């Protein structure tokens, strides 16, 4: 498909018929060219209900017929539910506007329609979800796993989420060969042709490398893309403690096997395709953040023996659970509280300094003031 195949002809005002579902399919195909799979999936989830509404409730078979009245009724229907968050509505309607702007370029939607999408304004404070994983909770979880489930897959997942702040998709993408624990492991880098450095330069680099570390790699051709694609590829140092846990897991507790592409996943699974899924990482994150699963009393006055959140497929029903993204937010705050500059966090976690400062970093203000006090004292050191 040519890039301009569905673009409106220059100066053309005449609309060309296009069904809503056809437009959605074409638009998503175009997004796949430069967006991460997870981003395209989120676009699909946001726009598909709109398309289904147009077809089922408004009887629209041709986007030429779409007008502001249809948008108003869809908007009213979404808001009338009462349980949708303002931030969620902002994201959905913003994506729908992008979809309609594509429809305008394709001469399928009237030029004024996209601007009639009423996107609610969301302040900076409203954009930030405050449900991070607090530092003390993370430490308690890791201490429990270290004592009772040492080097288990759950221990590895939780430790990696907290110490690296990586996305779930990045953890899923790790292979055994991406884990560097001993000097001999560095030999693997000498035979990788896609590092972009000459042999002599590489040897100088390796001479100064400190172990242990992991290397996040973008491998979309075998179904493990990184959200930031090639720019998300990066080596990340890990602590000696995490390195020891990784080593013990690999030697003793990892389920042996390969995935459907013959690769050896770090986070393997006994189920096909042999590699844990992103949703699988999410479920494990939910379980280890249930207080009753890590030796704590239930803060919600529930009986663990009867709690529905203990049942298979219901882990997210516990009010205390946190997704991998909340580990990431908590990790950023932990790094900042320990004095890490935003620029270094952004590099380590493959994000932007702006996001580190505006979204991820959610400090306890008194703790952050104590850090500033240390810096103030340095001003007067002799």
Regions found by a protein language model. Give the residues of each.
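Active-site/catalytic core of tyrosine-dependent DNA strand-transfer enzymes
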Residues: 239-319
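N-terminal core-binding DNA-recognition domain of tyrosine recombinases/integrases
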Residues: 9, 25-128, 254
């Amino acid at each position: 498909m040519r890039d301009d195949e569905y673009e409106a002809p220059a100066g053309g005002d005449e609309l060309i018929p296009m069904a809503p579902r056809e437009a959605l399919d074409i638009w998503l195909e175009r997004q796949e060219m430069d967006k991460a799979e997870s981003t395209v999936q989120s676009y699909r989830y946001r726009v598909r209900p709109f398309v289904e509404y147009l077809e089922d409730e408004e009887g629209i078979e041709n986007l030429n017929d779409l007008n502001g009245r249809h948008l108003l009724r869809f908007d009213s229907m979404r808001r009338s539910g009462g349980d949708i968050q303002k931030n969620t509505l902002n994201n959905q309607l913003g994506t729908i506007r992008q979809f309609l702007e594509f429809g305008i370029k394709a001469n399928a939607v009237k030029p004024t329609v996209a601007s009639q999408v009423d996107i609610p304004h969301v302040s900076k404070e409203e954009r930030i979800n405050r449900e991070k994983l607090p530092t003390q909770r993370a430490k308690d979880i890791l201490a429990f796993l270290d004592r009772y489930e040492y080097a288990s897959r759950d221990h590895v997942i939780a430790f990696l989420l907290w110490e690296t702040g990586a996305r779930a998709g990045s953890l899923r993408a790790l292979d055994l060969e991406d884990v560097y624990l001993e000097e001999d492991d560095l030999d693997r880098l000498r035979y990788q042709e896609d590092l972009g450095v000459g042999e002599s330069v590489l040897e100088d680099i390796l001479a100064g490398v400190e172990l242990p570390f992991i290397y996040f790699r973008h491998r979309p051709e075998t179904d493990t893309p990184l959200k930031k694609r090639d720019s998300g590829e990066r080596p990340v140092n890990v602590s000696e403690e995490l390195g020891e846990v990784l080593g013990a897991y690999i030697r003793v507790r990892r389920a042996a096997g390969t995935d459907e592409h013959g690769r050896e996943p770090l986070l393997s699974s006994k189920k096909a395709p042999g590699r844990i899924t992103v949703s699988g990482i999410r479920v494990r994150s939910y379980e280890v953040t249930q207080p009753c699963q890590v030796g704590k009393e239930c803060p919600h006055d529930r009986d663990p023996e009867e709690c529905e959140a203990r049942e298979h497929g219901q882990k997210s029903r516990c009010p205390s659970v946190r997704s991998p993204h909340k580990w990431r937010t908590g990790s950023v705050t932990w790094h900042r509280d320990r004095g890490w500059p935003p620029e270094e966090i952004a590099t380590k976690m493959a994000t932007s300094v702006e996001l580190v400062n505006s979204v991820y970093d959610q400090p306890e203000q008194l703790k952050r003031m104590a850090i500033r006090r240390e810096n103030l004292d340095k001003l007067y050191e002799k």
